[in-house]
Amino acid sequence: MGKVILAAALVLGFFLGMTGAGEEKTIKILLVAKDRDHAFSEHEYLSDCAILAKCLGQTKGVSAEVSNGWPRDPAKLKGVKAIVFNTRMGGSVLFDPLVKAQAEKLLKEGIGLSAIHWGTGAEKPAGEAWLKALGGWFNADLFSRYMVRTTRLLQADPKHPICFGWKEYDLREEYYIKLKFLPEAKPILKAVIDKEEYPVAWVYERPDGGRSFGFLGGHFHDNFGKEEFRRAIVNGILWTARVDVPPGGAPVRITAKDMELPPDPRKKK
């Protein structure tokens, strides 16, 4: 009888160990978005993050969750390996005095950090800290500019995982230019805008051991319908989470329904 109980305990322990090992391998990614603050189909933070979360979840061992604003419950941050800001001025969200201690702890732990479009921005009080965290800083009130153009999205480093699985293409986008960058930040994507070449995306390997990725596109919701557009962003987010990106790029399958936007409650009936 004792041997039977011992054998059962060993089997149970084996399966519990398997479950624990599986949980440990899950890479949790948190996408921070917000409610609309632009015209319909522009800066659709929540809908665009939902698309990215669906795509991220197609990579084995990865789970992604969207939060409207910084999570109020600290438990939501437990086990998170990478954070993505697709929101108004991500730097001011991350370094808000109410969450700054959390942010600094996460950065010291080497968490992956990504920012998309206006998420690359920060107001002046958070600017320098954001620059040191992301490697780049957008602020149209102080030094940056933006304009809508159709131009070729170019790969500055085709061998980088962010460039896996897609080819250069023409993209109509609201491009940000004249950002501040750390010398160590490395351009990954670029575009020629009004006859001058500018970075469109960059990577930065932080001294704390974490990886950061900035992508300046993302103004127009329609662009998330482009496979190559989604793949570059998803590849970049996975890279910050230290997930191996396959040579053909990350899977980014979506449906036409995924691109549908909810009604705009701001619109008068």
What are these regions (language model features)?
Residues 36-50:
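Glycine- and acidic-residue-enriched helix-capping/strand-helix junction motifs
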Residues 32, 90-164:
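A glycine-rich, often tryptophan-bearing local segment used as a flexible ligand/cofactor-contacting loop or short
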Residues 35-39, 70-72, 88-93, 113, ...:
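Solvent-exposed loop/turn segments at secondary-structure junctions
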